[in-house]
Amino acid sequence: MLTLTACGFSNWGSDIGGYGATENSEIYTRWLQFGTFSPYMRLHGQGEQDPWHWGDVAANTFVSHYWLRENLLNKIYSSAIKANKTGSPVSKSMALSFPGNSKLLNSESEYMFCDDLLVCPITDYLYHTKVTLPKGNWFDLWTGRLYKGGSEYDVDAPLNLTPVFIRSGSVIPVTVSGKTLSLTDKIESDSAVEALVVTAPNGKRQEEYWSDKNTRTVYTSSADGNMFTVSADRASKEKVILAYGINASEVKVNGKALEKLDHMPESDESGYYVDSYTKTVIRVPAADWNSISITLGGLLSKNLAENKKITTHSFRASDTKPENIVDGKKDTQWTVTKLDEAFFSVDLGKEETIDRVEVKWVNNSGYGKNYNVSVSKNGENWQEVSAVTDSDGMVDILRFDPVNARYVKVSDITAGGGKTVTVYDFGVYRSAYAATDGTDSGERIDMSETDDDETVPETKKSIIRKKRKVVRKGSPDIYYEYIETWVIVLGVVGGVLLIAGAIAAIILIKKKRGKKIKMEKE
């Protein structure tokens, strides 16, 4: 795939399911995910191609990723137009996207899709994987979690999701359900809403959106202290903005402040709502807009349960002790055997206002199909906040109304997929509306400019790539064409070999002719 794009083939895809015998549901499910983030996506081949043939996980993954593909169609279409105009492929290798980062030169496990989405497809039997993020801020597509670039991270890769990260300063046109205003949800024809997914920039960044081959909107994201502004060079008609990974304290549209709501904005109202740190949902007034300014609010919550005291009924072996699920590591686990009495409880150390719990199960292992989550202020009197009745055994993200609690307990576990259950991580998160005492361990989004991984190092010894400015006749745009140095080297070597071969052939022909003439004379 990366070789195809480097050779100029921008429009490609795979026959999901294949013509050979797909071995199992996990391969098929991972293939679905990869196809979602390819220039075109289709199920095609021989044998059973229908997702429901491969079990509930595959079927549910197909449904969520089918709607995600529908969400992203405007962005994919725009990228295809850009590819046609400039030659810049829809899917790019990391080396092509970030030529200034030598660590990404040989990266084959991740790539950029439509310039804004870093995709790390899973090609092995894994529930977590390592990913190297270029400099700048990155936001998890599924959770909104902030990752600071320039480092390698061990990230979740449950069977129903592939790791995808949104780049800082992104402005992504999407279509979402007007009922939920969320990605991956079913879009009914009478409730489709055009929206923009945006992320806080590092310094300043521009994005082009081609709604058709002749109509272009340029969005500019620029940071100023703890505020950033998204401006358009022409009136934007999108009425919904999904600001990922942002807990906004103020939002202004064309300079006018919007009301902060305590609920998801309805179709007939304007305002903004902070959706538990995952994103801020903004519904703008009916009029077209040219600028939206977002002021960052409180800290982004980290896992309050990490390295906290955990109490449980038992554990199976020393290498699967219960402390493993709150140690912040993804390669340590806790396996529970006696489910009739299984529970675990985490002491947060102090009373917190929480509204989200995450329970992460190991793929292809036993998991908690049914269980309850309860909270307590004193460890004795418990209040149930969530009852899980049909978990799929991957990552369960459980949301509930904000509640004050010091202790969080998971109990009444029944197994799915075996007689034991294995957990590798447990998380508890503070509500976005919680008051803090200033000791929050969360992180603020740093929007300062970073060293640009997109810039080619100014050195004659660079083996990354050369950069030349090209003006294409008939196009109003000046764009940059990146030429892989190894392609040039191979071209030169190939040319030399071709010339040498031609010379050798000429010499050989002359020798044969000389021998023939000599024989005729004799």
Residue positions per predicted region:
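Catalytic-domain carbohydrate-binding cleft regions of carbohydrate-active enzymes
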Residues: 1-160
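Catalytic cores of secreted or luminal carbohydrate-active enzymes
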Residues: 66-86, 124, 141-217
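Surface-exposed beta-strand/loop patches in extracellular or lumenal glycoproteins
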Residues: 125-135, 232-249
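Predominantly extracellular/luminal regions of secreted and cell-surface proteins
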Residues: 182-202, 300-327
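Aromatic, loop-rich ligand-recognition surfaces of beta-strand-rich domains
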Residues: 300-302, 327-386, 390-446, 466, ...
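Single-pass type I membrane protein transmembrane segment
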Residues: 487-498
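Single-pass type I membrane-protein transmembrane alpha-helix
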Residues: 498-511
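Cytoplasmic C-terminal tails of single-pass
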Residues: 513-522
